[in-house]
Amino acid sequence: MQPQGKMKKPTAEHMINENIPFQKVFVIGANGEKVGVLSTREAIEMAKEQRLDLVLISVQPKPIARILDYGKFKYERKKKQKAAKEKQTVIQNRQIRLTPLIGEHDLNVKARKAKEFLLDGDRIKVSLKFRGRESARPELGHKTLEKFYKAVEDLADIAKEAELVNDRFLDMYLQPNKIKVNKYRKEHNLVDKNSDSQDKSVSEEDTNEGEQ
């Protein structure tokens, strides 16, 4: 028999001992053995005799509770979650800004920075801005983006081809290619690392461009 009315689904922290909202549960012992169906009261007493807790671990298709040290259980679970989180690679979206008439030196500076992002596993938005009458020459922008991609294609794939946005920006999206990245690392004796640094987005103002 279950409680009357619509029951608010409790969190795991609430579903222990006297807070278990069922009169009977299928009990699993402290060593993983199947005890069987008991009244919740009996199961709680059994747990207390062992100085442990009765924890509801499942409600479908039937209520299942396990006898364990809930404090230790929470600690171990938190520890595992933290370890799993640390193993995750944080993928960030970076940005590189260009202009159609960017000089060779500055293009190479941008490409080197882009390679740092790609080696960290980040995606890149390459945004080329047309200024003044440059918007009448979109082919210049495409040519610059093609040149930029050639400088980083040993690490990247084009995730999205160059597209004109608001008649002022030509945006292209790049993503790291794992096979290319691994090959590059081996060739350059680089150690893999997870990037947790702050946004490294670069604008043309961040580099010393030569006179055009």
UniProtKB/Swiss-Prot annotation:
Keyword rRNA-binding: no
Gene Ontology annotations of biological process type: ribosome disassembly
Sequence similarity: Belongs to the IF-3 family.
Superkingdom as given in the UniProt entry: Bacteria
Organism: Mycoplasmopsis fermentans
Subcellular location: Cytoplasm
Keyword Acyltransferase: no
Keyword set, alphabetical order: Cytoplasm, Initiation factor, Protein biosynthesis
Basic and acidic residues: bias regions: 190-203
GO cellular component, one term: cytosol
Region of interest (Disordered), residue spans: 190-212
Protein's UniProt name: Translation initiation factor IF-3
Taxonomy of the source species: Bacteria, Bacillati, Mycoplasmatota, Mycoplasmoidales, Metamycoplasmataceae
GO molecular function terms listed in the Swiss-Prot or TrEMBL record: ribosome binding; translation initiation factor activity
Role of this protein: IF-3 binds to the 30S ribosomal subunit and shifts the equilibrium between 70S ribosomes and their 50S and 30S subunits in favor of the free subunits, thus enhancing the availability of 30S subunits on which protein synthesis initiation begins.
NCBIfam families from the UniProt entry: infC
Quaternary structure and interacting proteins, as annotated: Monomer.
InterPro entries, per the entry: T_IF-3_C_sf (IPR036788), T_IF-3_N_sf (IPR036787), Translation_initiation_fac3_CS (IPR019813), Translation_initiation_fac_3 (IPR001288), Translation_initiation_fac_3_C (IPR019815), Translation_initiation_fac_3_N (IPR019814)
Gene3D superfamilies xref list: Translation initiation factor 3 (IF-3), C-terminal domain, Translation initiation factor 3 (IF-3), N-terminal domain
Pfam families: IF3_C, IF3_N
